[in-house]
Curated annotation (Swiss-Prot):
Changing L284A: Impairs interaction with HSP90AB1 and HSPA8. PPIase that catalyzes the cis-trans isomerization of proline imidic peptide bonds in oligopeptides and may therefore assist protein folding. Proposed to act as a co-chaperone in HSP90 complexes such as in unligated steroid receptors heterocomplexes. Different co-chaperones seem to compete for association with HSP90 thus establishing distinct HSP90-co-chaperone-receptor complexes with the potential to exert tissue-specific receptor activity control. May have a preference for estrogen receptor complexes and is not found in glucocorticoid receptor complexes. Changing R312A: Abolishes interaction with HSP90AB1 and impairs interaction with HSPA8. It comes from Homo sapiens (Human). This is Peptidyl-prolyl cis-trans isomerase D. The modification Phosphoserine is found at S5, S198. The lineage of its organism: Eukaryota, Metazoa, Chordata, Craniata, Vertebrata. Signal peptide: none annotated. Keywords: Acetylation, Apoptosis, Chaperone, Cytoplasm, Host-virus interaction, Isomerase, Nucleus, Phosphoprotein, Protein transport, Repeat, Rotamase, TPR repeat, Transport.
Length: 370
């Protein structure tokens, strides 16, 4: 008979803790920290722990290192699970346990009754190897068929980012990989706090912070601190780090908005809008024109008459040589702020570009029919 999964994190302080540092498309997203239920399924837990450390050397059946480092999440299904652990073929057809190719189902003590449970992938009864999955919703149809052997205790936000990556079928469009992995020792903080020298003392993901997300005043203090760190990076022209900090602000805002009353959400809008606009400005500096346009659209969803968003989106359109789109945004901005000198100057510049483009086209046609 299966039992409800433990609610405490960790469920047993003596259980081993392991970690994955996850990269998506070559960029570090964050860390997932997992508790392994060695008190309930010791053989299954030991298999996974050793695959995280790589201490067992080369596998007998695969001829590959028994190690998750460099292993992709090869299968992702939204509102279901994220799957990885095929370190040999990297597509779901391979892998190997530390005990040999396969080992038996140890027990089905825990149910798949919530998000963030770690369970063994298999090809039927008693076919456990190295492949695993992390649930992103309750999956009761897997009870009695797959062995639950751990849980996410930190980094569920990283798992959610993985869950929501673009996929082709069930395969991520960008490579989602376990860049680093290992075992955490007693006293380790789990590595969830930024180590980027920025002075950021807040976990990257609000789910890992020991705060009440309903405390809007506390959230405002945290997000203002993070925004200021982002601004410092912006001033030093470190656009990527600035974006990272502004995005962290938005994660805290979104997590708080999800649990607070509607009336309180308005208090968080100004800082959210400011950071979305700043992300757009960073992307313009990086010549990421489409990214800047997308950020400005997000800002306009928060404030449809925001002239900064219209102005910056017009700059993005110009980067793509979509001058008519730029002209439309600037005319709308001018209608809202007719005295704004910067908008007037940009409008003149775009009109000149449109004229130059038309003159060039006329010259081409003239040569064609000469």
């Amino acid at each position: 008979m299966s039992h409800p999964s433990p609610q405490a994190k960790p469920s047993n302080p003596s259980n081993p803790r392991v970690f994955f540092d996850v990269d998506i498309g070559g960029e570090r997203v964050g860390r997932i920290v997992l508790e392994l239920f060695a008190d309930i399924v010791p053989k299954t837990a030991e298999n996974f722990r050793a695959l995280c450390t790589g201490e067992k050397g080369i596998g007998h059946t695969t001829g590959k290192p028994l190690h998750f480092k460099g292993c992709p999440f090869h299968r992702i299904i939204k509102k279901f699970m994220i799957q990885g652990g095929d370190f040999s073929n990297q597509n779901g057809t391979g892998g190997e346990s530390i005990y040999g190719e396969k080992f038996e189902d140890e027990n089905f003590h825990y149910k798949h009754d919530r998000e963030g449970l770690l369970s063994m992938a298999n090809a039927g009864r008693n076919t456990n190897g190295s492949q695993f999955f992390i649930t992103t919703v309750p999956t009761p149809h897997l009870d009695g068929k797959h062995v639950v052997f751990g849980q996410v205790i930190k980094g569920i936000g990283v798992a959610r980012i993985l869950e929501n990556v673009e996929v082709k079928g069930e395969k991520p469009a960008k490579l989602c990989v376990i860049a680093e992995c290992g075992e955490l020792k007693e006293g380790d903080d789990g590595g969830i706090f930024p180590k980027d020298g920025s002075g950021d003392s807040h976990p990257d993901f609000p789910e890992d912070a020991d705060i009440d997300l309903k405390d809007v005043d506390k959230i405002l203090l945290i997000t203002e601190d993070l925004k200021n760190i982002g601004n410092t990076f912006f001033k030093s022209q470190n656009w990527e780090m600035a974006i990272k900090k502004y995005a962290e602000v938005l994660r805290y805002v979104d997590s708080s908005k999800a649990v607070i009353e509607t009336a309180d959400r308005a208090k968080l809008q100004p800082i959210a809008l400011s950071c979305v606009l700043n992300i757009g400005a960073c992307k313009l500096k990086m010549s990421n024109w489409q990214g800047a346009i997308d950020s400005c659209l997000e800002a306009l969803e928060l404030d449809p008459s925001n002239t900064k968003a219209l102005y910056r989106r017009a700059q993005g359109w110009q980067g793509l040589k979509e001058y008519d789109q730029a002209l439309a945004d600037l005319k709308k901005a001018q209608g809202i702020a007719p005295e704004d000198k910067a908008i007037q100057a940009e409008l003149l510049k775009v009109k000149q570009k449109i004229k130059a483009q038309k003159d060039k086209e006329k010259a081409v046609y003239a040569k064609m029919f000469a």
